[in-house]
């Protein structure tokens, strides 16, 4: 299973670090994903959920 938020679709993205001389190097920005158990179609299932989804109440834990 890929590390993508089941509810919001948030995932790892690539970005650049920029120095004062505007040199660039690649970096990755990772979301704060938590493994949680939720009810999906009446059955408990473990999925990845972003901390933002958990805080906003989009996720109902078992």
UniProtKB/Swiss-Prot annotation:
It holds the Pfam family Ribosomal_L28. InterPro entries: Bacterial_rp_bL28, Ribosomal_bL28, Ribosomal_bL28/bL31-like_sf, Ribosomal_bL28_bact-type, Ribosomal_bL28_sf. GO terms for cellular component: ribonucleoprotein complex; ribosome. One of its GO terms (biological process) is translation. GO terms for molecular function: structural constituent of ribosome. It comes from the Bacteria. Keywords: Ribonucleoprotein, Ribosomal protein. Belongs to the bacterial ribosomal protein bL28 family. This is Large ribosomal subunit protein bL28. The gene is rpmB.
């Amino acid at each position: 299973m890929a590390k993508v938020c089941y509810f919001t679709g948030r995932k790892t993205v690539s970005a650049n670090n920029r120095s004062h001389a505007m040199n660039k190097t690649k970096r990755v920005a990772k979301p704060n994903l938590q493994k949680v158990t939720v009810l999906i179609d009446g059955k408990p299932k473990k999925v990845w959920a972003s901390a933002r989804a958990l805080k906003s109440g989009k996720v109902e834990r078992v």
